[in-house]
């Protein structure tokens, strides 16, 4: 079933509402959620690999060794990067650089390398305290569905991550033009 304008409105509303709380999570709290996410992704590794074989026709060995594994590798890299990232930094001219979440992020991913693309967009947004609406390719929705289950099991609050299946001309366009989507 493809999403529509009502689904987009519901997801944007949920993400905007959740942003008010999630954007105030400490770096430590966000790291804990990312570490939980890693544990659940590792536990659901085979489900991710099988979903990409089913939805894309990739050989299972390739799905395991390259596709599903890339998502876990990216997640580990983002965890390490966040650990080193200062929230405030004095730059060379004396100004203070403050890093803060931008808001609601609408993330649209292609059919190829689905978990790779999802993790490269969703994880950095969650790491810095943004809320997300993911619209995966309508041709590869299975891995995104499993990823949404992983997010929920990892303990992210409701509304922080939202999944809408739909096509680009409908859901993609609505998300891209929505006044309450910040990025």
Which functions belong to the PLM regions below?
Residues 1-94:
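N-terminal Rossmann-like NAD(P)+-binding subdomain of aldehyde/semialdehyde dehydrogenases
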Residues 86-183:
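Rossmann-like NAD(P) dinucleotide-binding subdomain of oxidoreductase/dehydrogenase enzymes
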């Amino acid at each position: 079933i493809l999403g529509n304008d009502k689904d987009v409105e519901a997801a944007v509303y949920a993400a905007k509402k959740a942003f008010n709380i999630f954007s105030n999570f400490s770096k430590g709290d966000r790291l804990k959620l990312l570490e939980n996410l890693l544990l659940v992704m590792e536990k659901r590794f085979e489900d991710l690999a099988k979903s990409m074989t089913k939805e894309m026709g990739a050989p299972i060995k390739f799905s395991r060794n390259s596709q599903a594994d890339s998502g876990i590798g990216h997640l580990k890299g983002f965890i390490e990067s966040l650990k080193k990232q200062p929230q405030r930094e004095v730059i060379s001219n004396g100004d203070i650089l403050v890093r803060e979440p931008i808001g609601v992020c609408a993330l649209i991913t292609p059919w190829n390398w689905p978990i790779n693309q999802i993790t490269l967009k969703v994880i950095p947004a969650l790491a810095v305290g943004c809320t997300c609406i993911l619209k995966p390719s309508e041709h590869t929705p299975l891995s995104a569905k499993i990823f949404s289950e992983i997010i929920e099991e990892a303990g992210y609050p409701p509304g922080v991550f939202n999944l809408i299946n739909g096509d680009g001309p409908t859901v993609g366009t609505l998300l891209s033009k929505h006044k309450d989507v910040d990025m």
